[in-house]
Amino acid sequence: MKKFLLAGLIAAGAGSVMAEEAPATADTVQTNLNIVWTLIAGILVFTMQAGFALVETGFTRAKNAANIMMKNIMDFAVGSLGFYILGAALMFGASKAAGWLGWGGLGMPSLSGGEGFWDWTFFFFQTMFAATAATIVSGAVAERIEFKSYLIYSILVSAIVYPISGHWMWGSLAGEGSQGWIEALGFHDFAGSTVVHSVGGWIALAGAIALGPRIGKYRHDGKANPIPGHSLVLGTLGVLLLWIGWFGFNPGSYTAGIGSIGRVAMTTNLAACAGTIAALVTAWVVMGKPDLTMALNGSLAGLVAITASCDQVTCNAAVVIGLVAGVLVVLSVFFFDKIHIDDPVGAVSVHCVNGVWGTLAVGLFAAPASLGYGNDLVGLFYGGGFKYLGVQLVGVGMTAVWAFGMGFAIFMTLKKAGILRVSAKTELKGLDVTEHGQDAYASFQFFSNM
């Protein structure tokens, strides 16, 4: 009897609570859906940190594996705090100086008149992007940069360099009063081919130049010595993780649970597949062998290239963008080797070169409203003329000047201070033991002539 009485009281209480609650409106349901989807997308983007760590570790030597892992986890940790304390305000605060700078006070600026669920969700998602821009550089400076210098770089990029250029192109994501000067021209970069990847790629180029090549990379006759990574298995797993993460990176950039996310996921995947195949074929022709590392970088190149236009192009255009990216990444790797810029993982070729290509591709392939796309500007190949391409070129050019210039200034300052590059003895022995007193593979013995 007591059990039935208790059940009745619970049912009555639940009924009264339900009676007091107002029914959810369509707007409330959509807002909650947007929050859930954006959080899921942000978590997917976070998995890209693991992808980058595995790619960089696999493409470099075993004696530096722990150092690579340490750099990747620490650039996320210090970068997230730097973006929270200062970067978010610079990127999404109210526009100052005609859209050249944002400011909303230290800490996370408010988007809704006070801290709310959407504010937290939005800035969680954007923090993942800031961390991605910072970690791109790790591979290009691998096996020779001092750990403390890398920490300094990570803080400066996440707190200052990335947010300032990000405001120019994405400031209005926080509201109309935050519009940057480049986006006011009509510039379009949906998920960050330039805002994220080119920024990281240009800084990676600056770092590789400032550091110089690894010991033994180039012979006296100018030809490059191959320095193979120790695990193509780790590298492949890393690329697959990045590929998965990109389904949060691109579709998640709507920050809304709407039907268009399916189209963006489709164009993203097609470009990645096309990039993989194009890089494989190009490397096969040039090198005489179907090279796995080139195919893997082709996947990433296709993903980077489609990131700017994934919401504005057709599936056929996505394939073309990916094919071009796959060819470019292979030719770019050989080009940088030819001019003695040592990039152990091909970060500059993947993120800088194809970030530029992907951003310009918006001005070529942006589809018109007649095909179901609500674009204000139409690409050159659809009769839109050169205006859109010109606007995209402005964004690419200004980002190159800012990111490369600031990156080079940071790395050269560290070099002048004598803390940028490890000693030759440390480099030859490996950074795991010398920098961290640890060995990533303590139970294994590796044989190497370098």
What spans do the regions from the language model cover?
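Glycine- and aromatic-enriched membrane alpha-helices
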Residues: 19-450
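N-terminal secretory/membrane targeting signals
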Residues: 1-20
